[in-house]
Amino acid sequence: LMIRSGAPDEFGSAYRLLSGAVTPRPIAWVSSRSPDGHDNLAPYSFFNVVSIDPPVLMFSPVGRAPDGLKDTARNILGDAGTGERGDGDAAGSSAFVIQLASVDLAEAMNASSATLDHGESEFEHAGVTPVEADEVDAARVAEAPVAFECELYEAHGVGGSTMILGELIRAHVDEVLLTDSEFDITDYDPLGRLSGGLYADTRNRLELERPD
């Protein structure tokens, strides 16, 4: 199977290959705020941890909206797409919250990916509750078992996508997932993305002992 970058119709082929083969992927359920105070919520499965010291997470909105950056990226980075204000550009908030959706929030997470009219709330459309973040200018999903408040660390354009890195400022974790103040995966059931409309849970687990 040959994939040639830049060839006609190769974006679709590459997307189907990579999104189908690189699975399951964790899902960043990202909330952000526009300059006019509108709260946005959307899921992104090109997402992971990239550093522990400092604690940095990355997600990447793939592709662009017809009029430029997708709402999440524009809210964080501003019209210039850099996190800085250009001539005539609105500055971004440089802030966002990454939620991890559990399986029982799958329908809500999926609903938040709908294309809504400007000013419509993805929180309301998905039936979840916005709660003001403690440290950053954004709302978070009250029902999410894990939420990471982040400040923009770096952003990079990669082809037609935008890689956004955020430094973890504050974490919110459901008490049932904590044992002696440490994260306990026993009752954690995060949603994973496969391909198309397929998702995975993490109920079936395999434990391996690491070799010396």
List where the protein language model places each region:
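Basic, polyanion-binding surface patches
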Residues: 1-212
